């Protein structure tokens, strides 16, 4: 994927690049008040939702085109760049006409290739930064596919926004981070800037600060944070928005670590990791060899491949062993689920010969 820098004039290259503003543009006064407070804290890029794709009808679905005039006024009054979400070709045309500086594609839209293609077609011949949120479901290929569609339309100033993934289980997060997915995105497209959206991942303002720090520790390039002049009275997502003062406090507390060249001591530790990985692979190979022998025995004696009782016993015992060794039981469960799946696959090959 051929990419160019998304940075606009006057935006520093140091991490994090911050995009901040309310979830929704509600009134002209609210938009301007929030923008002026953020600008006073040194923020350069303003965000506000003009069209809001709500899960169910009846909620506030955005102020619409009227709000674009307010964003134009933000640019004029504060000098900030302005950004908003687009979900249709009509949104794109209205934003371009209003001089919006940065566009982003929302999670629900990213999940629909037809909608993404419509947006990509509307952007042909335009040079504007476009950020693409991850789809609501944890599908990396769908996320990359959306980026590729827009890139194929000729846009090179692209970035990704990690806002977490929808889950029925909302014990801690509104949307599960599943950090391994944006990490894999970074591995696949190393020069793609990645922003973290702690507001949508956490769903609660008290989670914004730790999520911002975690994103920085994972070498994310930027943050897109919902900030409102009066969060408790917000018309949408009130619980996850913070005031400009609180946002400034959070940003000032961030510890920004750098990627440095490996020192000799770090190189030695990594060598130990490599040796451990080699040992793991060798031991897994031995385990699969025994699993194949078991598969042969099952075939000869007419025994089914899947033995549910034995499988449950393995998961319980290995989970407990892992906890005793300082590892998370859920982590152990995932590992042995994957090992069991491969064992079953190899035994099925023997059974079906």
Residue ranges and their predicted role:
Residues 1-19, 73:
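N-terminal amphipathic alpha-helix/helix-capping segment at the start of soluble metabolic enzymes
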Residues 11, 115-249, 253, 261-264:
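Catalytic alpha/beta core domains of metabolic enzymes, predominantly
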Residues 16-33, 57-61, 80-86, 106-107, ...:
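Active-site mouth loops of central-metabolism enzymes
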Residues 16-22, 44-48, 82-84, 103-105, ...:
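Hydrophobic faces of well-ordered beta-strands that scaffold small-molecule active sites
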Residues 35, 39, 44, 63-81:
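Long, contiguous binding/interaction regions
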Residues 47-66, 229-238, 294-305:
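Glycine-rich, proline-tolerant flexible connector loops at the mouths of alpha/beta enzymes
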Residues 63, 79-92, 101-116, 128-140, ...:
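Catalytic beta/alpha-barrel core
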Residues 259-353:
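Domain-level signature for soluble enzymes in the chorismate/prephenate branch of the shikimate pathway
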């Amino acid at each position: 994927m051929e990419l160019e820098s998304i940075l606009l004039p006057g935006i520093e290259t140091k991490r994090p690049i911050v995009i901040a503003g309310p979830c929704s543009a509600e009134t002209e006064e609210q938009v301007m008040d929030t923008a002026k407070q953020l600008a006073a804290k040194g923020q350069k890029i303003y965000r506000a939702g003009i069209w809001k794709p709500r899960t169910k009808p009846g909620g506030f679905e955005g102020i619409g085109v009227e709000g674009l005039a307010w964003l134009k006024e933000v640019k004029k009054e504060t000098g900030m760049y302005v950004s908003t979400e687009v979900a249709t070709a009509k949104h794109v045309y209205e934003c371009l006409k209003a001089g919006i500086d940065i566009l982003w594609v929302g999670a629900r839209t990213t999940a629909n290739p037809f909608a993404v293609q419509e947006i990509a077609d509307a952007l042909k011949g335009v040079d504007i930064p476009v950020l693409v949120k991850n789809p609501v479901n944890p599908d990396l290929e769908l996320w990359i596919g959306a980026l590729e569609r827009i890139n194929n339309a000729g846009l090179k100033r692209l970035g990704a926004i990690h806002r977490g993934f929808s889950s029925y289980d909302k014990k801690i997060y509104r949307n599960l981070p599943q950090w391994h997915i944006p990490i894999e995105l970074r591995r696949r497209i190393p020069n793609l800037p990645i922003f973290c959206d702690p507001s949508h991942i956490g769903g609660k303002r008290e989670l914004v600060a730790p999520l911002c720090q975690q994103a920085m520790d994972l070498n994310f390039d930027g943050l897109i944070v919902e900030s409102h002049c009066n969060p408790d009275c917000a018309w949408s997502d009130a619980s996850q928005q913070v005031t400009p003062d609180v946002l400034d406090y959070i940003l000032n507390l961030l510890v920004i670590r750098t990627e440095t060249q490996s020192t000799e001591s770090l190189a030695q530790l990594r060598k130990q990791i490599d040796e451990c990985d080699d040992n793991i692979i060798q031991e897994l190979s031995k385990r699969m060899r025994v699993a194949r022998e078991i598969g042969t025995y099952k075939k000869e004696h007419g025994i089914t491949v899947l033995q549910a009782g034995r499988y449950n016993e393995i998961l319980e015992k290995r989970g407990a062993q892992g906890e005793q060794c300082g590892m998370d039981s859920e982590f152990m469960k995932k590992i042995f689920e994957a090992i069991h799946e491969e064992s079953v696959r190899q035994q099925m090959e023997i059974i079906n010969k």
